[in-house]
Each structure stands twice: as C-alpha cells, then as structure tokens.
Design a protein with these regions (language model features):
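Short, surface-exposed acidic/glycine-rich loop or hinge patches that mediate macromolecular interfaces
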Residues: 41-44, 138, 142
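Structural signal for conserved beta-strand scaffold positions within catalytic alpha/beta enzyme cores
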Residues: 38, 134-136
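Long, low-complexity intrinsically disordered regions enriched in Ser/Thr/Asp/Glu with frequent Gly/Pro
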Residues: 119-122, 133, 140
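Conserved catalytic-core segment of NTP-binding enzymes
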Residues: 1-127
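A general secondary-structure junction signal
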Residues: 70-72, 136-139
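Phosphate-binding and hydrolysis-coupling loops of NTP-dependent motor/remodeling domains
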Residues: 130
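C-terminal accessory extensions appended to soluble enzyme cores
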Residues: 134, 142-168
C-alpha cells in the first residue's frame, strides 16, 4: 500500500498523476504529517513480523515510525506458584490431589506464558528502540462497550505519557 505512490510516480513520468504521487511520497516521508503506528501481540511470530515491517517501512519508504502498540499483554502475576500454594493451605477448601495438581499445572503454564511474553517484549524493545504502548489482554469471548471504553482509557493514558518529540 505505501509503495503504490512510488509505482505511480515511476509509471507516470509527467502530468497530474506524477505530481500527486510525488506529493503523497513527500507527505509520507514527512514525520510532521505522517507517522505509522504498528500493532503486534507479544508472541514470537507477530513480533518478528513487526520488526521486519518496521525496517522495511523506515528504510525502503522513509516513513517515520511512532510508538509500537502491543495488544493483549497479560498482567504480571509474580510468585503465582507461592500464592496458589498459600491460598490453598490457608483456605478452608478441601482440595483433592488432582485439584492441587491442576492448580499447579495452571500456575506453571501461566508462568511460562508470562516468561515468553517478557522475552518478546524485551526483544522488541532491544531491536526496535520505539516507545511501547501496551494494551491489556481482555479475558472473555467478546468485547462490548465497557471493554472498549477501558481499552480507550488505557490507550489515551499511554499516549499522554509518551515523551514529546525531542524530549527523548
């Protein structure tokens, strides 16, 4: 899509189409008029795709990149194994061995997902020195007006917290 103006400019050597293509190329190359914000999720393949796309957009097209938006970020749950064990021991619940095993397995799975997520977020930050706007994972099968409002609030706060251009 962003390569189209260059194709039109090269195909139409003169005339209105050529002038308009040149104007579009000037616009998308001007960071005051055009900034691209790419969105990913904190998993290996999507992060790889964002990195590749970012370099292509900047190097090949000269388009300025804005902050990276990372969608569906799981909340950190430090010490989840200990918390589950403590809660199980302190509560009046009479858990079976199978239930304790299931809780331990679930905690291990969640801890592994969080570790992978942190690795990808760290890698993204190391390879692409862009600010990151992180949107929380929404648990559930649908998103309604309430969830959209919550995400909008998080997004607005994150944008307001970004450093001003030149303050970095």
């Amino acid at each position: 899509f962003l390569r189209s103006p260059a194709g039109v400019r090269d195909a139409a050597k003169t005339g209105v189409l050529h002038r308009q293509a040149v104007e579009v190329l000037e616009m998308i190359g001007d960071p005051d008029r055009c900034t691209v914000m790419l969105v990913t999720i904190p998993e290996e393949t999507p992060v790889n795709e964002m990195i590749e796309t970012s370099f292509a957009i900047e190097e090949e097209l000269g388009v300025h990149l804005g902050p990276a938006v990372v969608n569906s970020v799981l909340p950190d749950l430090d010490d989840l194994d200990h918390e589950l064990a403590t809660l199980a021991a302190e509560s009046s619940l009479d858990l079976t061995d199978n239930e304790r095993t299931a809780l331990t397995t679930a905690a291990g799975f969640r801890a592994g997902r969080l570790r992978l997520q942190r690795e990808q977020l760290d890698r993204l930050g190391a390879v692409l020195p862009l600010d990151q706007i992180r949107l929380p994972h929404r648990f559930g099968s649908s998103i309604g007006p309430g969830e959209i409002a919550e995400l909008a609030t998080v997004l607005t706060s994150a944008i307001e917290a970004l450093p001003e251009e030149g303050d970095e």
